[in-house]
From Swiss-Prot:
Its cofactor is Zn(2+). The keyword S-adenosyl-L-methionine does not apply. Binds 1 zinc ion per subunit. This is 7-cyano-7-deazaguanine synthase. Zn(2+) binds at residues 187, 195, 198, 201. It comes from Chlorobium chlorochromatii (strain CaD3). Catalyzes the ATP-dependent conversion of 7-carboxy-7-deazaguanine (CDG) to 7-cyano-7-deazaguanine (preQ(0)). It is an enzyme of class 6 (ligase). The keyword Metal-binding applies.
Length: 228
């Protein structure tokens, strides 16, 4: 069975790739450039991960309209990337409004063309930034949208294997599957050394600490988030 990976190049999409490959799917990978600060580094990670897993069928999409819409510190350079507060329950400024719905729509279009029946996305609801389009209920609803909005003979399902996992469990799963974490990129701010203090870096560093593992990428600073 053919499956599409929505592969950002981050640690969650990397581990999702490892899971899908282990499950025996014929993989095609999609990456979306949307004007984010770390666009080139994420694209490099996407290509490295695809090469590692010998994924030949790839689609790189330019969706810079999300940057033009704005509203996120990932795409609007006038908005600072905030320092992580892992105790906060507020949705951070890094949230890109309704981004995942747009990504999924493009993936469904491609799936119809190439005959893929599954779309894998590394969304995480537990132990995450709290983005509304990373909730299980959102993906359940989107699967209904796919059912209603595609041809009767089309059967495409969005799969979220990490949705209920803690971040440290994702790290452990990646280690178990020999996922190349050194190829992945999570920082919202930098393309050279990861900053270590943005929300995404903090969640990643805490996850590796809780898993008892050393994160292989370079950081400007490595705060300890184990008590956060």
């Amino acid at each position: 069975m053919k499956a599409i990976l929505l592969l950002s190049g981050g640690m969650d999409s990397l581990v999702t790739t490892a899971i899908a490959q282990q499950a025996g799917f014929e993989l095609a990978a999609m990456h979306v450039n949307y004007g984010q600060r770390t666009m080139q580094r994420e694209l490099n990670s996407f290509r490295a991960i695809c090469s590692h897993y010998s994924i030949q069928q790839r689609l790189e999409i330019n969706a810079d309209f999300l940057g033009k819409i704005g509203g996120s510190s990932l795409t609007d350079l006038s908005m600072p990337v905030s320092v992580a507060n892992l105790e906060s329950h507020a949705i951070p400024a890094s949230y890109v409004p309704f981004r995942n719905a747009g990504f999924l729509s493009m993936a469904v279009s491609w799936a119809e063309v190439i005959g893929a029946e599954r779309i894998f996305i590394g969304a995480v609801e537990e132990d995450s930034s709290g983005y509304p389009d990373c909730r299980k209920i959102f993906y359940e609803a989107f699967n209904r949208v796919i059912e209603l909005g595609t041809k009767p003979e089309t059967h495409i399902e969005v799969v979220t294997p990490l949705i209920a996992l803690k971040k440290w469990e994702i790290v452990r799963k990646g280690i178990e599957l020999h996922a190349p974490f050194a190829f992945s990129w999570s920082c919202y701010k930098n393309e050279g050394q990861a900053c270590g203090v943005c929300d995404s870096c903090a969640l990643r560093l805490r996850a590796f600490e809780q898993a008892g593992m050393e994160d292989p990428i370079d950081y400007e600073t490595r705060p300890h988030y184990i008590d956060c």
